[in-house]
Amino acid sequence: STDYRIETGDHDFVYGLPELNRRKICAANHVANPGCFATCIQLGVLPLAKHLMLNSELHVNAITGSTGAGVKPSGTSHFSWRNDNISIYKPFGHQHLAEIKQSLTSLQNSFRSEINFIPVRGNFSRGIFTTTYLDCKVGLDEIKRIYEEYYADHSFTFITDKNPDLKQVVNTNKCLIHLEKHNDKLLIISMIDNLLKGASGQAVHNMNLMFNLEEKVGLHLKPSAF
């Protein structure tokens, strides 16, 4: 539910993205779990926001499995429609954009850029694979250093030099991030399992923080063998 993800001043829910609000979550009475798309997209760009580097439009394409639609049956989640098929939905107007903008602005007060987000329905059951690109003149080595530094004390987000694929995160609570520079464009590839890091795994992570448990309790998950 998106009901308590946006700070409106009339509730005490903390936005439950540990890589952004770990300390606040530890002291919270109520936590609002982020959206799955919002989680994957934000993890790809939070380090840039912290260093005030989001100064151009963000172009985001993210493809999600059929379980991203929830448990309620629909025409676009039915196997016979989803199999060997692909389509976009809610282009430029997805409901997760509000929480993404809220988080980025909390780190970079000057952030006013457009987020051009195209969500895509994929022909697989679980996982989110996101590509984000933006203008950035900073060199790749420095960008990698910024990302490694930001996620150094976080247990589930990893920077990889190898071009990753979705099966490396399915059935885990991990997020993998891969960075590339193409002239003055920075390409960010991020991926999660929408049912774990994008939903129940993140809820368990938040619960562990709220109850002062080791944050990886119950989340030592291994990917399936493919």
Over which residues does each language-model region extend?
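C-terminal substrate-binding/catalytic lobe of Rossmann-fold NAD(P)-dependent oxidoreductases
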Residues: 57, 62, 66-190
